[in-house]
Amino acid sequence: MTIAEIRRAQTTHVGPNKKHLFAVGIFQMIPGTIFGKRKGDKCFMKWLSNYRYIKESEQLFDRKFQQLTPLYFWEDKQEPISLYFMGKTTVEEAAYAVSKEWASAAAPKNKETYKGKFISNGYMSYYAGDGMNKAHYSADVTIDALKETKKIIDDFGGYSLVKETTLLALNK
């Protein structure tokens, strides 16, 4: 599917149950994440436009294109993640940012959950208590994954080089 086809499918109700396409791709991106809800919202397409013009009617939402989404999440949507990879904040702050983005990731121990409802024990979703979301893995799992990712990034030559290389792949 092209970006334009996804935009249409995510805003058009189809079929007898009036269902529409909602979360798409490897990272299960919802309409607000890809396109924003209102003008001025942070969103993937707006972030990407800082680096390249995208013709939505031609650009496929393929695996290669979707590989750019981690950079968006790290830099724009949950900046503490990229700051950790650059050595400018703690792994706990990065893990907290992950928990805010993905309900299945537990908030780190002693961090507040959404609206300050609870203090996490390291196994609670940031959205605990909303009746819909629960963590599927502990904050320690996220912390370990972030540490491993940072090592890979550092071994590659640092965050800036990873970003540059990833963005260059889109232009090929």
Predicted regions and their residues:
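Catalytic and binding regions of secreted/periplasmic enzymes and modules that target cell-wall glycans
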Residues: 20-170
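Short, structural beta-strand-to-alpha-helix junction motif
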Residues: 1-18, 30
